[in-house]
């Protein structure tokens, strides 16, 4: 008899799954605040790239990573999901 629900086991789910589970159950004000902080970071990053004339390079790199460096891209996205989930959990 297994007393643990495998769907609840954070060790078998992905960072993406964990984030969405946490974001659905956490205080929505905190979730929204952390999401907005992440978008602010993205906006500043884009501004820096624009100021340096690198916005086209960003699109090229994104296409290249999707095509040839998929694991690296997934790892980077997973780190962002982990960061968001951690920021939410530490405030609840």
Regions found by a protein language model. Give the residues of each.
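Charged low-complexity stretches with an acidic bias
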Residues: 57-92
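Short, functional C-terminal segments
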Residues: 1-7, 12-18, 22, 82-92
């Amino acid at each position: 008899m297994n007393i643990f629900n495998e769907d609840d086991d954070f060790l078998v789910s992905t960072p993406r799954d964990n984030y969405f589970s946490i974001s659905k159950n956490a205080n929505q004000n905190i979730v929204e605040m952390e999401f907005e902080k992440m978008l602010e970071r993205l906006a500043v990053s884009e501004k820096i790239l624009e100021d340096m004339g690198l916005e086209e390079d960003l699109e090229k790199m994104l296409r290249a990573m999707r095509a040839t460096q998929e694991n690296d891209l997934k790892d980077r996205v997973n780190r962002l999901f982990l960061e968001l989930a951690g920021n939410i959990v530490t405030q609840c």
